[in-house]
């Protein structure tokens, strides 16, 4: 039972569902599983993509993360996540509070924090056709009428790998642009905005890549997404397994710096 006198400053709603309740009971919270950047689903980088990435102020981010992803310690990330408090949006550590800021995002990742807010209406109708218009290939529709489409929110990384693994040497400028867009879509949805499946690129992060001249605040979106996902990780402790679906690298660097 929640006792305000024992935990001054804590919100009863958050505390009753926080993973810290398990620790207080003497139980060990389940290890959170990492979902994100898979080196086996990395596309081949091509310098011909750079003019497009530079126009969107994302070249530095791509150069930082185009290689093999760094090794991540799931246990350390779980421990850090368990110290997140929604009341303050910060990690409460023995040495004090620590939070991840927009400056951290910009300095560590290279994502731009200036520009338009990455918001808008998400329209599911016709998403396959919109994907085809931007990358030149339409994802196959789900044909099994006896089952619900298991991936209505995007395409499999294996599909992207199959169609866009390497840009042809004799590709036209239009084809190079499509491959560049798909490369960036693949990288963003694996590194910054992964989902719970661990194998799907959400189509809603492809729409902002339509116009290379639009300056989006990708860093702000990344930080908001990270905060939301960390909140989901520490709440609802009664689930046996949880997946960490956010920007693992930035949280690892901030954790190491403490």
Residue ranges and their predicted role:
Residues 238, 248-251:
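Intrinsic disorder/low-complexity segments
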Residues 1-230, 234-235, 239, 244:
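N-terminal leader regions that mediate targeting or early regulatory function
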Residues 243, 253-254:
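Acidic, Ala/Val/Gly-enriched low-complexity intrinsically disordered segments
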């Amino acid at each position: 039972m929640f006792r305000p006198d024992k935990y001054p400053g804590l919100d009863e709603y958050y505390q009753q569902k926080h993973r810290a309740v398990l620790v207080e009971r003497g139980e060990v919270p389940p290890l959170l599983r990492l979902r994100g950047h898979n080196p086996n689903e990395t596309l081949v980088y091509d310098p011909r993509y750079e003019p497009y990435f530079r126009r969107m102020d994302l070249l530095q981010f791509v150069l930082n993360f185009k290689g093999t992803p760094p090794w991540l310690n799931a246990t350390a990330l779980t421990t850090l996540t368990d110290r997140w408090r929604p009341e303050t949006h910060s990690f409460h550590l023995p040495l004090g509070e620590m939070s991840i800021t927009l400056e951290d995002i910009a300095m560590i990742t290279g994502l731009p924090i200036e520009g338009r807010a990455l918001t808008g209406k998400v329209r599911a109708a016709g998403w396959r056709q919109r994907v085809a218009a931007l990358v030149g290939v339409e994802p196959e529709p789900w044909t099994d009428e006896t089952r619900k489409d298991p991936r209505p929110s995007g395409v499999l990384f294996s599909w992207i790998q199959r169609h866009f693994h390497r840009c042809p040497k004799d590709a036209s400028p239009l084809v190079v642009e499509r491959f560049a867009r798909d490369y960036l879509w693949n990288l963003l949805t694996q590194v910054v905005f992964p989902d719970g499946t661990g194998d799907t690129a959400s189509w809603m992060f492809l729409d902002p890549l339509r116009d290379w001249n639009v300056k989006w605040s990708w860093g702000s979106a990344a930080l908001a997404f990270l905060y939301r996902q960390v909140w989901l990780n520490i709440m609802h402790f009664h689930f046996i397994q949880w997946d960490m679906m956010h920007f693992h690298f930035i949280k690892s660097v901030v954790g190491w710096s403490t």
